[in-house]
């Protein structure tokens, strides 16, 4: 019984630690700008600097990472809308802007099943603009996800997902910039149905702004 209890605690500890890190990042992203800029400069409704972005890439889950048991490979297509919240935040190396990303990702599952998963993500993002052409950024958030795929261990079609990661934007042309991203991605049904074996994945994406 003691050994079993320790195993259960370890599984929950891994899941809770990942969730805690994600929530902590979101709190930083969402609250920091309010302390760094004057409220008069906030442009919550202004969409003049908003833009559309499109990304594509590859993702893979790793058995043994947390409670993940299946190796699931996906081709990811991610159209998204980037809404500027605060511009010209901070100074020096951390000068940048704060935005909200709204994504409608399509995950084309290529293994072990051939099917799709579709989600809706709301991500907080901070982009560093001190560099001349390269602009790194951090992001985190999540949302609902529906799975058409038959993946062992996923006991529900409706799931939740959260993710966080880092990326870089490179100035190519006046209206088209190159995007490169690496992100951690978690999918589970939150215990609403059994079985509930989550997918802990890494994803690499490239894209363009327009």
Residue spans for each PLM region:
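Residue-level signature of outer-membrane beta-barrel architecture
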Residues: 83, 126-128, 168-170, 208-210
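Cleavable N-terminal export/targeting peptides
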Residues: 1-46
